[in-house]
């Protein structure tokens, strides 16, 4: 938790930023935006073998209930406005994980006329998970990296 000091009477001293970020890292609620085969690996990560619940990661069906969006798969031009609309409906603070080669940069379909060459052209991306499709372990590693990134951010303006 980043405890700075411990007093004799059982008090813990720390900063508000540390407490808020600790709470945020332990309760990530991702909304799935599964577009292709990467979504199957995302479902695999949420199943019993990897069990994202033990990390405080609980999948939510609504953008208004989630603070992380996992974009998994090929993003086509017709779907790009819907992605942005869903992103705008998420409450602040919000984070985006781009999962797979297609979401990262177009992947196998990079030169197709109807493909967005990376979801970072539509929404700001915090973590990129490589692979085609990436394994459940890679997604889990990406989410742990997102938790580390959240711990390092300042929440209170100085």
Curated annotation (Swiss-Prot):
InterPro entries the UniProt entry points to: NADH_UbQ_OxRdtase-like_20kDa, NADH_UQ_OxRdtase_20Kd_su
PROSITE patterns: COMPLEX1_20K
Protein's UniProt keywords contain 4Fe-4S: yes
One function term, GO molecular function aspect: NADH:ubiquinone reductase (non-electrogenic) activity
UniProt keyword annotations, A-Z: 4Fe-4S, Cell inner membrane, Cell membrane, Iron, Iron-sulfur, Membrane, Metal-binding, NAD, Quinone, Translocase, Transport, Ubiquinone
Cofactor note: Binds 1 [4Fe-4S] cluster.
Source species, domain of life: Bacteria
Catalytic activity: a quinone + NADH + 5 H(+)(in) = a quinol + NAD(+) + 4 H(+)(out)
EC number(s) stated in the UniProt entry for this protein: 7.1.1.-
Stated role: NDH-1 shuttles electrons from NADH, via FMN and iron-sulfur (Fe-S) centers, to quinones in the respiratory chain. Couples the redox reaction to proton translocation (for every two electrons transferred, four hydrogen ions are translocated across the cytoplasmic membrane), and thus conserves the redox energy in a proton gradient.
Family: Belongs to the complex I 20 kDa subunit family.
Entries under PANTHER family matching the protein: NADH DEHYDROGENASE, NADH DEHYDROGENASE [UBIQUINONE] IRON-SULFUR PROTEIN 7, MITOCHONDRIAL
Assembly, per entry: NDH-1 is composed of 14 different subunits. Subunits NuoB, C, D, E, F, and G constitute the peripheral sector of the complex.
Descriptive protein name: NADH-quinone oxidoreductase subunit B 2
Source species of the chain: Acidithiobacillus ferrooxidans (strain ATCC 53993 / BNL-5-31)
Gene this chain is encoded by: nuoB2
